């Protein structure tokens, strides 16, 4: 079927709605939305992909490919109906396949049967044999591109025009692609030269494994790591994991299709003679049965693949906890009264921090206006007057990666980090904690090379006069995003004070972080506790209530792109990924649906694409985590300490998840007091600091005992060999060559070689009269916490800027990731219910 009045091989330049009526959207991706449509002249259904074109797209290539694909007419290839160009949007009209893709199908049904896989492989090979005789390659065979019609016919999609357009438009996108179905010769094309249509045969073998195991081999690996492994000369073709579940014929078919040497790999016509796809009984009825399993699940047994952690006894837990005292005039402790008398600077936002939901100004002077470490900034105690820094502007929510993998609500909420520039260096984010103890303090700062390191360099002996501060812009140049939480405190010129947000919390809290809902703009504090993960909405403090989000013990939390990473315990500790927007949406459901805790079901009971919480593979037994963003490359890494090694993962934007890069087996120090990544110039992966020892060189106050994740051999040196181990409390990289180290009663600012940062006007070493338990870096001071209080000291004067001491209360810092969260309990009863506070009032905190 062709649209009326369509010139041969041309794209119609008129309104496509004269020929097609859009019925409903059936999918969306990076390059546009896909709609179910109806031809207004014939009533026949079609699939219409609408793509927004931009200047620079190679339109002549698109026209050429449309001409080529128009010639392809085969029962196993999705038919091309026509194209339209209207208002800078390209409409591509194709045959509609009502059954959907095999990927969507197996997410619901579980693995296909062996006969169903054989039928799909036969039909796929028939379509490929036709394409190959026409001198064409598909290049993207996988479950997501194999469709079923309502009658069980198998159709190859995303061939030709769609694939070529995708490749053309991808030039303007930061998208690597998914290499898991890629043949070795394609992965190594730059090294070994070209490839031919036999790469499609390899993809058929990988797809056969995908249909039987619900994912292709190496799917848990980061794509770049998978590409690297496939391009190596010693790469071994994958096999079906279960030797007993599948027949020897199926195993042999996969082995033949996955012949590593393309010269020995069979053609599509040759592979069609294999017993696996030539056996009798491979009819459309097999696909119809599969579709019935999707459409009528009650008539079929549920697929389950539970592991040891999936079902656990239901503990008696209060899923909703209300603050016991909401009376503002209630009796306050001595420390709470003093909280109101002290003001604090905003927390320092590190150059090495990447978490930035609300965005930063593109004004190159914006950083300097915040920076206390440039000459001309005010010094002195916290009560001195200082202009309130301009609020952060809202960041546009745009996506630069395929969205087909995400629910609609997740797509809408994705936030793209601003690109790196010379005027504002990239940032690193990090946080660390341990299951056995509360979290170590987190610092945060704005960094563009103008922070502590700039101050140190400008104030060294013999340095030139510091440059003048640029003109401060009017605050209206930086419109404040609307965030529903504790309001800023405009009368507090310095910033803010600690405010109580919850009375009488019965939970044993291990860690805390914060998150802003991208749609409602409500700000939440998220707590990791012995009884699970709980949230507190700061916009509803008048009826403060903590709601359980996840029922398992949690010792570490981190939020990235509306995804909550947690270290939670089932039978053992493991990393989890939680879709925050979907979890909050699920909690809103009325009646029984809201009480069905989907995370208690095995992963395979729920369709995988709709899973709200997923386990991170290869992280069982993880007991410590840290996250870092390399400011030189922009890559984000998560490192986990296992019982006998380290696992390194990298954040992959298109799939919005951390994926495995490397696994190292070796004994870690015990106890593991330090576990922090340090970014080193010109190194692809960070170094992992696992201990601190006394410096052995001249002027070296500390030595970082590190593991080099970049080396395949000799990457591990004996920790502490011939050196004195130090009992470090906290290590964090503030800037590229600036590390804060907390030891006993001292805070030291050192470089990556462990030497003090020299400065005439800044203290590179601060001492306190108590053993520090945790620290938070403020803009020009350090806030150190101890059992019965806290004390702030200025980097510039080494004077006490704030101090609270209350022997009747025991204090503990729960987290300082964007929002500083503090807990206190009565000294006489350390197991009593706790009060919770946040450092509130800074306009830039929300």
From Swiss-Prot:
Annotated Gene Ontology cellular component terms: cilium; cytoplasm; cytosol; plasma membrane
Biased region (Basic and acidic residues) positions are: 328-358, 408-423
Q: How does it assemble?
A: Interacts with both SH3 domains of the adapter proteins CRK and CRKL.
Q: Kindly identify the residues recorded as the active site.
A: 140 (proton acceptor)
Could you state one GO biological process linked to this protein?
A: intracellular signal transduction
Q: Into which family does the record put it?
A: Belongs to the protein kinase superfamily. STE Ser/Thr protein kinase family. STE20 subfamily.
Query: Can you name the source organism?
Result: Homo sapiens
Q: Positions modified as Phosphoserine? A: 335, 433
Record keywords: ATP-binding, Cytoplasm, Kinase, Nucleotide-binding, Phosphoprotein, Serine/threonine-protein kinase, Transferase
Q: Which GO terms describe its molecular function?
A: ATP binding; MAP kinase kinase kinase kinase activity; protein kinase activity; protein serine kinase activity; protein serine/threonine kinase activity
Question: What the protein does?
Answer: May play a role in the response to environmental stress. Appears to act upstream of the JUN N-terminal pathway.
* The protein's required cofactors: Mg(2+)
Instruction: Quote the tissue specificity entry.
Output: Ubiquitously expressed in all tissues examined, with high levels in the ovary, testis and prostate.
The protein in question is named Mitogen-activated protein kinase kinase kinase kinase 5
Instruction: Name the residue ranges with Polar residues bias.
Output: 430-447, 456-466
> What is the organism lineage in this UniProt record?
Eukaryota, Metazoa, Chordata, Craniata, Vertebrata
- CDD domains, from UniProt? STKc_MAP4K5 (cd06646)
Catalyzed reactions per annotation: L-seryl-[protein] + ATP = O-phospho-L-seryl-[protein] + ADP + H(+); L-threonyl-[protein] + ATP = O-phospho-L-threonyl-[protein] + ADP + H(+)
What residues bind ATP, as annotated? Answer: 26-34, 49
**Chain segments carrying region Disordered:** 323-485
């Amino acid at each position: 079927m062709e649209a009326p009045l369509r010139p041969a091989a041309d794209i119609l330049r008129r309104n496509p709605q004269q020929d097609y009526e859009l019925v409903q959207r059936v999918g969306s991706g990076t390059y546009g939305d896909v709609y179910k449509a109806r031809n207004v002249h014939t009533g026949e259904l079609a699939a219409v992909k609408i793509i927004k074109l931009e200047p620079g797209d190679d339109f002549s290539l698109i026209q050429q490919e449309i001409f080529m694909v128009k010639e392809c007419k085969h029962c196993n290839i999705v038919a091309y109906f026509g194209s339209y160009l209207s208002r800078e949007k390209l409409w591509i009209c194709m045959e509609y396949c009502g059954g959907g893709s095999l990927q969507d199908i197996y997410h619901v049904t579980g693995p296909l049967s062996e006969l169903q896989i054989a039928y799909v492989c036969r039909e796929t090979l028939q379509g490929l044999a036709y394409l190959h005789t026409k001198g064409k390659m598909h290049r993207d065979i996988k479950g997501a591109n194999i469709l079923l019609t309502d009658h069980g016919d198998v159709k190859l999609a995303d061939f030709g025009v769609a694939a070529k357009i995708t490749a053309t438009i991808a030039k303007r996108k930061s998208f690597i692609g998914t290499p898991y179905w890629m043949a070795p010769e394609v992965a190594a094309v730059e090294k070994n030269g070209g490839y031919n249509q036999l790469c499609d045969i390899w993809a058929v073998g990988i797809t056969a494994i995908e249909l039987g195991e619900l994912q292709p081999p190496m799917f848990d690996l980061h794509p770049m790591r998978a590409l690297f492994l496939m391009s190596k000369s010693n790469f071994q073709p994958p096999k079906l994991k279960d030797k007993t579940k599948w027949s020897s014929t199926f195993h042999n078919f996969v082995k033949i299709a996955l012949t590593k040497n393309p010269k020995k790999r069979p053609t599509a016509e040759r592979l069609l003679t294999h017993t696996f796809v030539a056996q009798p009984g491979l009819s459309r009825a097999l696909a119809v049965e599969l579709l019935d399993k999707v459409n009528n699940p009650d008539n079929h047994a549920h697929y389950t693949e539970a592991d040891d952690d999936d079902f656990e006894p239901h503990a008696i837990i209060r899923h909703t906890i209300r603050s016991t005292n909401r009376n503002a005039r209630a009796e306050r402790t001595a420390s709470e009264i003093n909280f109101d008398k002290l003001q604090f600077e905003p927390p320092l936002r590190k150059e090495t921090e990447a978490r930035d939901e609300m965005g930063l100004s593109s004004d190159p002077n914006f950083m300097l206006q915040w920076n206390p470490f440039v000459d001309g900034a005010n010094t002195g105690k916290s009560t001195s007057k200082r202009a309130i820094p301009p609020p952060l502007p809202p960041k546009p929510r745009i996506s630069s990666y395929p969205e087909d993998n995400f629910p609609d609500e997740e797509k809408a909420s994705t936030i793209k980090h601003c690109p790196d520039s010379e005027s504002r260096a990239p940032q690193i984010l990090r946080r660390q904690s341990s299951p056995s103890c509360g979290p170590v303090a987190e610092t945060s700062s704005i960094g563009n090379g103008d922070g502590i390191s700039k101050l140190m360099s400008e104030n060294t002996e013999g340095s030139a006069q510091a440059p003048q501060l640029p003109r401060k812009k009017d605050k209206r140049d930086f419109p404040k995003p609307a965030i529903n939480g504790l309001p800023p405190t405009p009368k507090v010129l310095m910033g803010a004070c600690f405010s109580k947000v919850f009375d009488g919390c019965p939970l044993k809290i291990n860690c805390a972080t914060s998150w802003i809902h991208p749609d409602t703009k409500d700000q939440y504090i998220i707590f990791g506790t012995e009884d699970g993960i709980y949230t507190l909405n700061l916009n509803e403090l008048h009826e403060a209530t903590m709601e359980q989000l996840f029922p398992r013990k949690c010792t570490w939390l981190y939020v990235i792109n509306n995804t909550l990473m947690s270290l939670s315990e089932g039978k053992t500790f493991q990393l989890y990924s939680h879709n925050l927007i979907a979890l909050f949406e699920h909690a809103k459901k009325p009646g029984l649906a809201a009480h069905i805790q989907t995370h208690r079901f095995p992963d395979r009971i729920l369709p995988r694409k709709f899973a709200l919480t997923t386990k991170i593979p290869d992280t069982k037994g993880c007991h410590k985590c840290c996250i870092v963003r390399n400011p030189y490359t922009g890559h984000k890494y998560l490192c986990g300490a296992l019982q006998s090694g380290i696992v390194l993962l990298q954040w992959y934007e298109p799939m919005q998840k951390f994926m495995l890069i490397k696994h190292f087996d070796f004994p870690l120090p015990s106890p593991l007091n330090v576990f922090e990544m340090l970014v080193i110039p010109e190194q692809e992966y960070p170094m992992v600091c696992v201990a601190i020892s006394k410096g052995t060189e001249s002027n070296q106050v500390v030595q970082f005992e590190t593991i080099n994740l970049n080396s395949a051999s000799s990457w591990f040196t004996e920790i502490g060999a011939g050196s004195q181990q130090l009992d470090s409390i906290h290590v964090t990289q503030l800037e590229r060559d600036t590390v804060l180290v907390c030891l006993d009663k001292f805070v030291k600012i050192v470089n990556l070689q462990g030497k003090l940062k020299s400065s005439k006007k800044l203290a590179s070493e601060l001492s306190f009269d108590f053993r520090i338990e945790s620290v938070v870096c403020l803009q020009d001071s350090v806030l150190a916490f101890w059992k019965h209080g806290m004390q702030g000291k200025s980097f510039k004067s080494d004077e006490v800027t704030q101090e609270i001491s209350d022997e009747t209360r025991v204090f503990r810092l729960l987290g300082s990731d964007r929002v500083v969260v503090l807990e206190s309990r009565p000294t006489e009863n350390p197991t009593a219910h706790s009060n919770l506070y946040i450092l509130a009032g800074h306009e830039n905190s929300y």
